Regions:
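Negatively charged, low-complexity tracts enriched in Asp/Glu with abundant Ser/Thr
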Residues: 2-55
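Amphipathic protein-protein interaction modules
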Residues: 52-110
Length: 110
């Protein structure tokens, strides 16, 4: 990784974080690098992320991979007994099926 992104929470392992939500601090985060994304898509990303953490718990992030593809990353604190890994997996699949248009638009944007 280049030193340019060494202490940058939005860039890690060649990935660029677009947005995410954290059930522990009940916050939504959006990478300001993508402020040019239309507001309607920003709202959809907010809804997707927050609803995910309300349903499954933990931390949910949407990231751009090196190849421009989009990945969903889910994580939970080690001692979190409320995080539902099965629900998280099902929700990721549901998002991929129902939000195809937005995901494709974001990949083109990136």
């Amino acid at each position: 990784m280049s030193d340019e992104y060494k202490d940058d929470p939005w860039h890690a392992n060649g990935r660029v974080v677009l947005c995410g939500a954290n059930a522990y601090d009940r916050k939504y985060y959006f990478n300001p690098e993508f402020n040019a994304v239309p507001d309607s898509i920003k709202r959809e990303l907010n809804i997707i992320s927050v609803l995910f953490t309300q349903e499954a718990g933990g931390i949910f992030t949407i990231v751009f991979e090196n190849d421009g593809g989009i990945s969903f990353v889910t994580d939970a604190e080690e001692d979190d007994i409320t995080y539902d890994e099965v629900s998280a997996g099902l929700l990721v699949g549901q998002i991929r099926r129902t939000r195809t248009e937005i995901l494709e638009s974001l990949e083109l944007f990136y």
